[in-house]
Design a protein with these regions (language model features):
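Positively charged n-region of N-terminal signal peptides that target proteins for export
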Residues: 1-4
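Eukaryotic scaffold repeat domains enriched in small/polar residues
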Residues: 22-348
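Bacterial N-terminal signal peptides
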Residues: 7-15
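Sec/Tat signal peptide C-region and signal peptidase I cleavage site
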Residues: 17-21
Length: 348
């Protein structure tokens, strides 16, 4: 197990240094990537508005899915030009408090709902194909959150899950998230295989403190945004820890691009806690190779586009066209990257 270096600038010098004397580069040394923003490109139906745009994803046709918290949780589909196509799952029992949406290689749409503790697989047409987890039973009136340690995690029951991904074999990985502090692996039919972490938060490699985002790369390695530990972790396909990425701020969300040469995009949206007073401190996204070498950064905090106000999730199917969902600005942006114009410079 090893720690990932956080800048390509220092790579040559590090190669000659002993492993335990290597000085980790800081974010100030990462080149800036130029980009342009296309805000307000989505066209909801008349009289409809996007709420907290916590989750975005695209399919192979370029259609865009937004899973958002409005008057109630809703899942909208738009075409590549941003025109509204349809709503999926209207009135669905598994929707209460949106957290993540992903699209698999067969264009099935998967939602992760923090409120119902359910992960749902929809067909491209919007038919429910699979459900993982279960909704808690109804209670009368408001109930206080139980004091003391979390209850032991169960194989098929989640506690405020956050994200979902798949390896090339179709195995399913879920970050189970706010209470259980674990990553769970299931086979493609939903049978439990393994887990990393437990209901007790921890800081060691292979332990988590609010695993907030998850993706699987083409090698089958699992990338986890370990939010309250201020890091990203990379696990192998059996959920054994390989390395961690630190010095990129809060591990808020992670996205892995498609294609033969994949990149990781990592969001440092604000200090942990998500308090309004912190929204203007950070807002950048980092682009990295799968070995952890950071190639550049882009973005800044701001209420108006092209600024970010807490990037909760990204789609990076095309590594030069990033779609962001922002929780505090209720906004979805399309970002066109111009990586050939990246210029070295200190972080702002």
């Amino acid at each position: 197990m090893k720690r990932i270096l956080t800048s390509s600038v220092a790579l040559a010098a590090l190669a000659a240094a002993p492993a335990f004397s290597q000085r980790k580069a800081t974010i100030e040394h990462v080149p800036s990537i130029e980009f342009s923003s296309v805000p307000n490109f989505l066209k909801p139906p008349p009289g409809e508005y996007l709420g907290e745009s916590v989750a975005v994803a695209t399919n192979s046709k370029g259609h865009i899915f937004v899973y958002h918290r409005s008057a109630h949780t809703r899942l909208f589909e738009f075409d590549k030009a941003g025109n509204f196509v349809k709503e999926i799952g209207s009135g669905y029992y598994g929707f209460e408090f949106a957290h993540s949406v992903r699209v698999d290689k067969d264009d099935n749409i998967w939602t992760v709902d923090e409120g119902t503790n359910m992960v749902t697989k929809f067909s491209p047409e919007g038919k429910v194909l699979m459900v993982l987890g279960r909704r808690p039973p109804a209670v009368q009136g408001a109930q206080p959150f139980p004091a003391g340690p979390n209850a032991p995690a169960q194989k098929y029951v989640f506690c405020r899950p956050t994200d979902v991904g798949w390896d090339p074999q179709g195995n399913i990985f879920v970050s189970d998230g706010y209470c259980n502090n674990r990553v769970v692996k299931y086979d493609k039919s939903g049978r439990f295989l393994a887990q990393a972490g437990s209901e007790k938060a921890g800081k060691a490699l292979g332990e988590f403190n609010l695993p907030h985002g998850l993706q699987v790369d083409g090698q089958g390695n699992v990338w986890v945004a370990d939010r309250s530990n201020f890091r990203y972790q990379v696990l192998d396909n059996n959920l054994k820890p390989l390395r961690e990425i630190t010095n990129l701020g809060v591990g808020w969300t992670v996205c892995i691009s498609s294609g033969p040469h994949q990149y990781a995009f990592l969001s440092n949206s604000n200090p942990n806690g998500n308090m309004p007073g912190t929204w203007d401190i950070t807002g950048e996204i980092y682009k990295a190779e799968l070995d952890g070498t950071v190639l550049g950064r882009f973005g800044h905090p701001g209420k108006l586009a092209p600024g970010f106000q807490v990037v909760h999730m990204m789609d990076c199917r095309n590594p030069n066209e990033i779609i962001t969902g922002e929780i505090e600005s209720w906004r979805v942006q399309k970002l066109i990257l111009h990586p050939t114009t990246a210029a070295a410079g200190a972080a702002q």
